[in-house]
């Protein structure tokens, strides 16, 4: 009697779990795998040295950020591309990424953020 009950309980627990098994589990677990569909945002600014951080925001490490200027016009092309993009490597603020030293940018704008210290780098490196 205890054998079938134990087997049913184990099968029930197995059905309810969604664990990674040894063959297919990435290092760090299921959610640790990087999103492979994200590409680098378009280059922008003088000499293409910057990257788009929003439809009107272009940031270049050496030059700072251009918001709503002619240097950022190319960034509007991102609205017409089918795949998402990401600039900057370090997350900051509410859905933003570190753009230049001390500055966090999201598609809505940029603001000063202490999380964007000297380690904030561009993904183009």
Swiss-Prot record:
Signal peptide, first to last residue: 1-19
UniProt xrefs under SUPFAM superfamilies: Neurophysin II (SSF49606)
Gene Ontology molecular function: neurohypophyseal hormone activity; neuropeptide hormone activity; oxytocin receptor binding; V1A vasopressin receptor binding
SMART domains linked to this entry: NH (SM00003)
Pfam family, one: Hormone_4
Subcellular location per the Swiss-Prot or TrEMBL entry: Secreted
BP GO annotations: drinking behavior; eating behavior; female pregnancy; grooming behavior; heart development; male mating behavior; maternal aggressive behavior; maternal behavior
Disulfide bonds: 20-25, 41-85, 44-58, 52-75, 59-65, 92-104, 98-116, 105-110
Residues recorded with modification Glycine amide: 28
Major location category of this protein: secreted
GO CC annotation terms, alphabetical: extracellular region; extracellular space; neuronal dense core vesicle; secretory granule; terminal bouton
Keyword ATP-binding appears in the UniProt entry: no
Keywords on record: Amidation, Cleavage on pair of basic residues, Disulfide bond, Hormone, Pharmaceutical, Secreted, Signal
Keyword Secreted: yes
Entry's family note: Belongs to the vasopressin/oxytocin family.
Main function: Neurophysin 1 specifically binds oxytocin.
SUBUNIT field: Interacts with oxytocin receptor (Ki=1.5 nM). Interacts with vasopressin V1aR/AVPR1A (Ki=37 nM), V1bR/AVPR1B (Ki=222 nM) and V2R/AVPR2 receptors (Ki=823 nM).
Name of this protein: Oxytocin-neurophysin 1
Species whose genome carries this gene: Homo sapiens (Human)
Lineage: Eukaryota, Metazoa, Chordata, Craniata, Vertebrata
């Amino acid at each position: 009697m205890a054998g079938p009950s134990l087997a049913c309980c184990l099968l029930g627990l197995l059905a309810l779990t969604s664990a990674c098994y040894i063959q297919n589990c990435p290092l760090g677990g299921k959610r640790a795998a990087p999103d492979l569909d994200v590409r680098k945002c378009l280059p922008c600014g003088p000499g293409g040295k910057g990257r788009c951080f929003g439809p009107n925001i272009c940031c270049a490490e050496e030059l700072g950020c251009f918001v709503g200027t002619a240097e950022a016009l190319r960034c509007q092309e991102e609205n017409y591309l089918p795949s998402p993009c990401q600039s900057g490597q370090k997350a900051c603020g509410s859905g933003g990424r570190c753009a230049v030293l001390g500055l966090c940018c999201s598609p809505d704008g940029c603001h000063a953020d202490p999380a964007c210290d000297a380690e904030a780098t561009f993904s183009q490196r």
